[in-house]
Amino acid sequence: MQAARMAASLGRQLLRLGGGSSRLTALLGQPRPGPARRPYAGGAAQLALDKSDSHPSDALTRKKPAKAESKSFAVGMFKGQLTTDQVFPYPSVLNEEQTQFLKELVEPVSRFFEEVNDPAKNDALEMVEETTWQGLKELGAFGLQVPSELGGVGLCNTQYARLVEIVGMHDLGVGITLGAHQSIGFKGILLFGTKAQKEKYLPKLASGETVAAFCLTEPSSGSDAASIRTSAVPSPCGKYYTLNGSKLWISNGGLADIFTVFAKTPVTDPATGAVKEKITAFVVERGFGGITHGPPEKKMGIKASNTAEVFFDGVRVPSENVLGEVGSGFKVAMHILNNGRFGMAAALAGTMRGIIAKAVDHATNRTQFGEKIHNFGLIQEKLARMVMLQYVTESMAYMVSANMDQGATDFQIEAAISKIFGSEAAWKVTDECIQIMGGMGFMKEPGVERVLRDLRIFRIFEGTNDILRLFVALQGCMDKGKELSGLGSALKNPFGNAGLLLGEAGKQLRRRAGLGSGLSLSGLVHPELSRSGELAVRALEQFATVVEAKLIKHKKGIVNEQFLLQRLADGAIDLYAMVVVLSRASRSLSEGHPTAQHEKMLCDTWCIEAAARIREGMAALQSDPWQQELYRNFKSISKALVERGGVVTSNPLGF
């Protein structure tokens, strides 16, 4: 019973996590489309200006219109729908001036990381070297998405992704320092801040004069963010809150001057008068007093970044430093994290690009058995798989960033997928690079072992991949569940809902019979990719059939079916990856890019294997008795390990 209650609680939090409910759909609004006011104004930067005169609660409290049909491909695929608005054609969002401005930034940033920054030295020092730190300030790297009017560079999400990719290619430790500062550290001020908060904090944060940190995780609160214990008690006069508690593993924790802190506060329900504890976000200055930090943590990787525990002891926080609405901190935190995940995928695409270059260089120059090793099939397959993973990750990153720049508000599943896929792909690519390089890859000098150490954390922070898989599956199933509920209601009045019933029921029956639902990507994918397009449609139908069957079987109880949800998420990730590369490769073929035929091969190869994985995975889920036995075995084996305190079986020798 306890496990069931825990699972149900986790499920409710996961469904809140991404904004699938109407409460979160309009939470903070993504950048609104419209003419650019500056050649490099857009995305979060322009949004910060657009909302400067608004009360921070506007996005949380304004009257929400009836929810429109989602344009998210990921939401649609759970329903067996081809929702292509956000994926075809592959989006191109930068105007000529924005493109030119970005090009002018790429060259100096690349040169800086090639000639000035020393990732090995940063790793050895376990800090960002002072020369690099000052150089980053001069480049404006601490305020890439802060509007120029507030001292930043004013980049949109797509421009930001391109520069983050360069950082990820060279030094993930520096990348974490910068990302913890602006991707999550002060992102809440950028998105939720009042005009006064923005004007007070953003200029110094953008220049690097002050550093920001995001304080959510606690010793007893990791993936379960709602269980935080840090408290903020309002004063009787209402002018300030007294903050007490601690936050664990905070990136920039020992460096930061400004903290985005999440704490429990008493909130009175206006309807009932009952007082409940809810999470509230605060902007907290180290200068308020009562803030200390522990020593830098000794870590496996990203050693150049500062990670420390932060303590708050009787910190007086002015009431005007509430970020967003009192009691809306969980939404603020989740929106900040959702908003920044595309940047992680972009950075890791850059990491893979650099690692693949090292692997190719070694394979091209290393001779064994009288042959360059790049001529051997085993090496060829490794290199091909490595570059496919990079291509998919990069395609996802720029797809999501472009969707955000175009004003999409429903991208949470796609952003989560990009984080899951990118972090796992980068690990695989780097591991294979070491394998190709052999003993040399294991040595410190080439720097690949450092990258592998740095990469391990990416599957853990900003939402563990395990939790995000549950989120992807549950969020998608929630939307499909609403549709099934609608069909159930329609059946009570069949004559008044004949069109709906005939359309949806017909598609469902055709899918179940294996006849196909008439969906097609014809006219969207390039003719040379038509076979791969057909594979994607077939995979979508297979996936949607299983989603529907499992929802009908488990109903709301599906939140407890983590074995199933994980496998549905894997299918969703593969399916989204197929569509993204189909879109990107189609654009390259249509525009006659020099690499178009190479991209076609990457796309076709990916789709062939992904379709096979989806087909096999969904077939296994449909073999219900076998799957249930498998799940029971997992539970029993795990229970035995827990009861024994480790491995149950004895050594084969008996002692």
Curated annotation (Swiss-Prot):
Mod. after translation: S-nitrosylation at Cys-237 in liver improves catalytic efficiency.
Subunit and partners: Homodimer. Homodimerizes after import into the mitochondrion.
Subcellular localization, as worded in the UniProt entry: Mitochondrion inner membrane
Protein name: Very long-chain specific acyl-CoA dehydrogenase, mitochondrial
Catalytic class of the enzyme: oxidoreductase
Positions where S-nitrosocysteine occurs in the chain: 237
Residues that bear N6-succinyllysine: 71, 195, 239, 276, 278, 331, 372, 482, 556, 639
Domain of life assignment: Eukaryota
Catalytic residues of the enzyme: 462 (proton acceptor)
GO biological process: energy derivation by oxidation of organic compounds; epithelial cell differentiation; fatty acid beta-oxidation using acyl-CoA dehydrogenase; negative regulation of fatty acid biosynthetic process; negative regulation of fatty acid oxidation; regulation of cholesterol metabolic process; response to cold; temperature homeostasis
Disordered as annotated region, ranges: 23-42
Family to which this protein belongs: Belongs to the acyl-CoA dehydrogenase family.
Impact upon substituting residue 218 to K: In ACADVLD; likely pathogenic
